[in-house]
A protein has these predicted regions:
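Interfacial loop-to-transmembrane junctions
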Residues: 216-218, 251-277
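Membrane-water interface of transmembrane alpha-helices
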Residues: 25-38, 80, 200-209
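Transmembrane helix-loop junctions in multipass membrane proteins, especially transporters and channels
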Residues: 33-41, 123-127, 149, 175-178, ...
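Transmembrane alpha-helical segments of multi-pass membrane transport proteins and ion-pumping complexes
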Residues: 21, 25, 29, 119, ...
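Hydrophobic alpha-helical transmembrane segments
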Residues: 1-22, 26, 118, 122, ...
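Membrane-proximal soluble regions of multi-pass membrane proteins
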Residues: 32-106
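Functional transmembrane core segments of multi-pass inner-membrane proteins
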Residues: 4, 16, 130-245, 287-293
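Select subsegments of transmembrane alpha-helices in polytopic membrane proteins
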Residues: 104-111, 156
């Protein structure tokens, strides 16, 4: 199958784009619902530990599958055709079919950006096993980025499977000589450990000096997962890229937008973005800037 798709790169890119549009629609559900599910679980656990009454929750199950999506304004159930990625939003004019309330443009944006990122990966790696796994990594990084952006939270239920998939993929090497992905197990293991410990060490050093927390444990796990996928050789590139871009944007927001410097800014999106770029062009970046690692 991959051989047939490899013979028609444009077809593979088109299929990848269409597939990612559908997955992007589901990722919108993950981005919205998973933090709510986690909060409900935490509240129940806190009530159990405090031996108090469990918090009242809406009736019925609430997970990534049920209930079906509804309009947040009127509660009207979203029909199948209204879930068509991007197109349904355009056909409805960005408004609910029932109450005409405005629908956030973020939903089609997430769908389209997810598809665009996957299409770039398909173009870069082609119809190869390396390309398929790069798509998997991309689809994990999208909800990690958005949830951290919204909540300053990186769920273990996403980042830990990403870590273990990366370690598992290092045991499978169908393309000898392929660069970045399908690294040797020692490189993946060292990458995971070094990625976690590097930010963990910085966290405690920063806290010791300033008395403040500079980042969260989810950031450690995310860099560990990226190290498992890409190898320890690319950790320095990811750290430098994410730190420079994050610091530049943070300073710009403070200077030009008056952002309160005491308000924390999530670091996960910068790590995810740097990891994704490194996955595609890591060697070129290291060579251009003459990075030592």
């Amino acid at each position: 199958m991959l051989e047939l798709l490899a013979a028609s790169p444009a077809v593979f890119i088109a299929i990848a784009f269409a597939f990612a549009l559908l997955i992007g629609s589901f990722l919108n559900v993950v981005i919205y619902r998973l933090p709510i599910m986690m909060e409900r679980e935490w509240r129940a656990q806190c009530a159990e530990l405090a031996e108090t009454a469990a918090p009242e929750l809406p009736e019925g199950r609430f997970n990534l599958v049920v209930p079906r999506s509804r309009c947040p304004s009127c509660g009207a159930q979203i029909t199948a055709w209204q879930n068509i990625p991007v197109l349904s939003y355009l056909m409805l004019g960005g408004r609910c079919a029932a109450c005409k309330a405005e629908i956030s443009a973020r939903y089609p944006v997430v769908e389209f950006v997810t598809a665009l990122l996957v299409a770039v990966v398909a173009w870069r790696f082609g119809a190869t096993w390396q390309g398929l796994m790069a798509i998997v990594l991309t689809l994990f990084l999208v909800p990690i980025t958005m949830i951290d952006f919204d909540r300053c939270l990186i769920p273990d239920s996403i980042v830990l499977p990403l870590l273990w998939i990366g370690l598992g993929m290092s045991l499978w090497h169908p393309q000898p000589g392929a660069d970045v992905l399908f690294i040797a197990p020692p490189d993946a293991i060292i990458g995971a450990i070094a990625g976690y410990l590097s930010l963990w060490s910085f966290y405690w050093l920063f806290k010791l000096v300033t008395g403040k927390e500079g980042m969260g444990y989810g950031d450690f796990k995310l860099l560990g997962a990226l190290g498992a996928w890409l190898g320890y050789q690319y950790l320095f590139t990811i750290i430098i890229m994410s730190a420079v871009v994050g610091a530049t944007l943070g300073i710009a927001l403070i200077v030009f937008r008056g952002r309160d410097h005491q308000v924390p800014m999530p670091f996960g999106p910068f790590l995810a973005g740097a990891g994704w770029i490194t996955m595609l062009w890591g060697d070129a970046i290291k060579g251009f800037f003459n990075l030592p690692f």
